[in-house]
């Protein structure tokens, strides 16, 4: 398995106070997405993992939409730090 370069972000921010924050959850989902993506590069026919990846992507997308509506500055900072694209809001 490939070592995840973003695991340090979670360890740095892991306090009992902010585990439920939207930013922490997005970082956690991003780590899981990257880990599953590297797994699926090796195992292309693992359809259960593909389904799990789609579910996590949807959860992260909903959290990012919530965060962009509530606090646009924190949203921009987070997507810049995680190097993910800005979501299209309907």
Swiss-Prot record:
Cystines in this chain? none
Q: Which GO terms are recorded in the biological process aspect for this UniProt protein? A: translation
UniProt KW Acyltransferase keyword: no
Select a single GO molecular function from the record's annotations and give it.
Answer: structural constituent of ribosome
Q: What is its main location?
A: plastid
Where does this protein reside within or beyond the cell? Plastid, Chloroplast
Q: Say which domain of life the source belongs to.
A: Eukaryota
Cellular component, GO, one term: chloroplast
Keyword set, alphabetical order: Chloroplast, Plastid, Ribonucleoprotein, Ribosomal protein
InterPro entries assigned: Ribosomal_uS15, Ribosomal_uS15_bac-type, uS15_NS1_RNA-bd_sf
Q: Subunit comment for this entry? A: Part of the 30S ribosomal subunit.
Task: Give the similarity note.
Answer: Belongs to the universal ribosomal protein uS15 family.
Record's protein name: Small ribosomal subunit protein uS15c
